[in-house]
């Protein structure tokens, strides 16, 4: 057989742009939409006039001080690709400011008695953030664009409501809502200590009771959470949570769980703003939600259901999940820098500063610097990009079309913006994910399934793909042709040249391989027939209006396979939620999406893994794995390596390399273009403190790892 792997030293030509650029990335999973109340909210009114900013303060030095929980940014600048003149990274500071101050908006509310004084709103030990470039001034509005109720990640990413979070480098776990954590030597017992005196955005206390409410009344409730999240299990048993005090939560696992703290910092766990619409998120505003939960409502389930039906919902669980979804329900208290004032179901999704936010800068100014965030609904991506070209947005990377780069450059002075490329190491754009469990789905057909699960067949498809054409037509030639294991500049790269024969255009070898698989017969149109005589047709399922032109890219691949291989194809283009539904039900044979970098292969395994029930490659096998059943062949090896990495922190790095090698060796996904700009960020010229470039990943929720609460507008909105 042709499937032999060559190993060797390979020099990879990198882009000579001074930086490595990237595009508009997708999210790891399709988002669900929570039903809105019957009456649609009116568009948000324009924010109030900006309060006068305090006198400008001297810019802080660009050398970012070292903290206990993060490396000094300057030590990592070169590794991150930061060049001379680039903004350094933000970091946490151990030095508590001698005094604290607040925005004029919060000061006015405190003076009017509508909120407590600042000292009663901040925790005893606030999170202290050293901005990347300079101490900022208060005021202004962050204008953005969004595409509708399924675009929740548009603001979930910058708001990072996780108990712990990552540094800008995307690897170092650091404090956030929680100020510290511990683990025993066996990695079976953990504690997380919250900041004392934390407040929700409505002023109520945030304590471990909010974690235990989620554990006991949400995760454990089958109506809200029929299947507890995979991260909350160890050795087939749920983790045990114990509140040791108002500030200290203890977590015990049946087996060693060395990856748990990293997962808590990542989007996998996150908080209710990110995960609340699905009943997940590790904590929840118990003081608010108890009024909708039958465990706390007089009359129990019957009364809770009656209240839900009166509000237009089928049952209490659906109503409860809506109430816990802050993007759709502005009443829901939040722990983020800004709080929602106008829901995501409106034509204008609006937020305002949270005067109870727990973070300050190194001079004691309560964050965030900007007062408001206003996102205008764009009817489609073309409209959103036209608004960005015209300079209507303050900072916008999401949904920006790289193919319009020349137009953006031409209009940058007129629109008063600059352009940054935020980089995601080892990112695959428009990968082709073959569903190895399609034969187990509702439309599965054994003969075709036998080819989809055959790595030689996938290798032939890969070698029949003309990647250079895809790169030039859709990505301006800014991407690179290669696979996941090509030796790219990535700290998690296996360091071997694995499976790269399969990403080189080689139609002769591909056709010989297909012939050897019994696909040597063709119809009158030159399309290959399966041994039964039925024509082999591969259906490509794609989401429309979702980050990349998946419809166009896959249409090109289908035509390439027809011409180069005699493999017929069909394009199934659906709105994103419908596309996601087809994947969930295992109806899709092949779907196209990005991969969020090698670093996320184990932390967020939905792209490359076979252990996530919402993943792309083998959903049913992932469900089996959650029940202790391993798949056969390479997928079973992937699952065992994953399990070992989760339990044993020392095995993590080596296993991370090996699992991606398995993807490369078995040609799933089939990569098309690698390492293109992930976010082409359009940024007003007077915005400060945005790292350049900002390392990008899904698991660290970029732009959240750039600490947007420290971004500020010199001279206000322009």
What are these regions, as identified by a protein language model?
Residues 2-10:
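Bacterial N-terminal signal peptides that target proteins for export
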Residues 10-18:
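Hydrophobic helical h-region of N-terminal Sec-dependent signal peptides
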Residues 24-96, 106-108, 166-169, 182-183, ...:
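Extracytoplasmic/periplasmic ligand-capture domains
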Residues 101-102, 107-185, 216:
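N-terminal lobe/hinge region of extracytoplasmic solute-binding protein
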Residues 133-157, 177, 260-269, 442-448, ...:
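A structural "hinge/loop" feature
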Residues 230-317, 690-693:
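Surface-exposed binding/hinge segments that line
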Residues 484-488, 684-686:
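Outer-membrane beta-barrel and related beta-rich outer-membrane complex signature
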């Amino acid at each position: 057989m042709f499937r032999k792997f060559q190993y060797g030293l390979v020099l990879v030509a990198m882009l000579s742009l001074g930086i490595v650029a990237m595009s508009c990335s997708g999210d790891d999973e399709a988002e669900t939409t929570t039903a809105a109340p019957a009456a649609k909210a009116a568009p948000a009114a324009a924010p109030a006039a900006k309060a006068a900013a305090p006198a400008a303060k001297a810019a802080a030095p660009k050398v970012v001080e070292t903290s206990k929980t993060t490396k000094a940014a300057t030590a990592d600048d070169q590794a991150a690709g930061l060049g001379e003149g680039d903004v350094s990274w933000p970091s946490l500071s151990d030095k508590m400011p001698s005094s604290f101050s607040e925005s004029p908006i919060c000061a006015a509310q405190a003076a009017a008695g509508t909120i407590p004084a600042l000292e009663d709103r901040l925790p005893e030990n606030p999170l202290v953030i050293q901005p990347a470039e300079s101490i900022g001034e208060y005021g202004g509005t962050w204008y953005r664009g969004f595409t509708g109720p399924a675009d929740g990640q548009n603001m979930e990413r910058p708001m990072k409501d996780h108990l712990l979070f990552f540094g800008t480098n995307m690897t170092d776990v650091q404090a956030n809502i929680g100020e510290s954590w511990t683990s025993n030597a066996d990695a079976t017992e953990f504690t997380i200590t919250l900041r004392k005196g934390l407040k929700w955005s409505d002023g109520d206390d945030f304590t471990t009771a909010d974690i235990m409410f989620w554990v006991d009344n949400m995760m454990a409730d089958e109506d809200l959470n029929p299947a507890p999240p995979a991260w909350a299990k160890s050795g087939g048993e749920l983790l045990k949570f114990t509140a040791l005090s108002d500030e200290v939560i203890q977590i015990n696992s049946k087996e060693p769980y060395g990856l748990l703290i990293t997962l808590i910092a990542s989007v996998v766990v996150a908080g209710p703003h990110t995960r609340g619409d699905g009943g997940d998120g590790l904590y929840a505003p118990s003081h608010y939600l108890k009024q909708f939960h039958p465990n706390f409502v007089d009359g129990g389930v019957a009364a809770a259901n009656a209240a839900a039906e009166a509000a237009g919902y089928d049952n209490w669980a659906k109503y409860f999940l809506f109430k816990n979804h802050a993007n759709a329900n502005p009443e829901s208290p939040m722990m983020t820098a800004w709080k929602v004032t106008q829901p995501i179901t409106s034509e204008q999704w609006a937020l305002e500063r949270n005067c109870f936010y727990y973070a300050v800068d190194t001079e004691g100014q309560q964050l965030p610097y900007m007062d408001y965030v206003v996102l205008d609904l764009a009817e489609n991506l073309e409209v959103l990009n036209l608004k960005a070209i015209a300079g209507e947005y303050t900072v916008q990377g999401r949904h920006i079309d790289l193919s319009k780069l020349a137009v953006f450059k031409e209009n940058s002075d007129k629109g008063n913006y600059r352009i940054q490329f935020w980089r995601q190491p080892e990112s695959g754009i428009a990968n082709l994910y073959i569903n190895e469990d399609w034969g187990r789905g509702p439309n599965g057909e054994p003969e075709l399934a036998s080819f989809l699960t055959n790595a030689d067949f996938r290798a032939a498809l890969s070698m029949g793909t003309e990647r250079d054409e895809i790169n030039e037509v859709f990505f301006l030639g800014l991407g690179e042709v290669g696979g996941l294991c090509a030796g790219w500049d990535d700290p998690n790269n296996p360091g071997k040249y694995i499976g790269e024969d399969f990403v080189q255009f080689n139609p002769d070898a591909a056709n010989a391989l297909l012939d050897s698989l019994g696909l040597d017969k063709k119809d009158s149109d030159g399309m290959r027939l399966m041994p039964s005589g039925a024509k082999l047709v591969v259906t490509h399922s794609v989401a429309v209006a979702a980050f990349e032109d998946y419809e166009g890219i896959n249409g090109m691949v289908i035509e390439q396979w027809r011409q180069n291989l005699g493999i017929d194809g069909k394009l199934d283009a659906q709105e994103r939620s419908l596309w996601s539904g087809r994947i969930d039900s295992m109806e899709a044979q092949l779907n196209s999406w990005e991969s969020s970098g090698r670093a996320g292969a184990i932390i967020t395994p939905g792209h490359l893994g076979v252990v996530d029930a919402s993943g792309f490659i083998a959903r049913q096998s992932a469900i089996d794995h959650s029940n202790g059943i391993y798949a056969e062949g390479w997928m079973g090896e992937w699952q065992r390596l994953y399990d070992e990495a989760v339990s044993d922190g020392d095995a993590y790095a080596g296993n991370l390399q090996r699992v991606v090698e398995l993807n490369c060796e078995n040609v799933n996904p089939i990569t098309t273009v690698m390492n293109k700009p992930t976010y082409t960020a359009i940024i007003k010229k007077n915005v400060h403190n945005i790292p350049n470039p900002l390392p990008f990943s899904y698991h660290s929720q970029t732009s959240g790892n750039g600490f947007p609460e420290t971004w500020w507008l010199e001279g206000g909105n322009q």
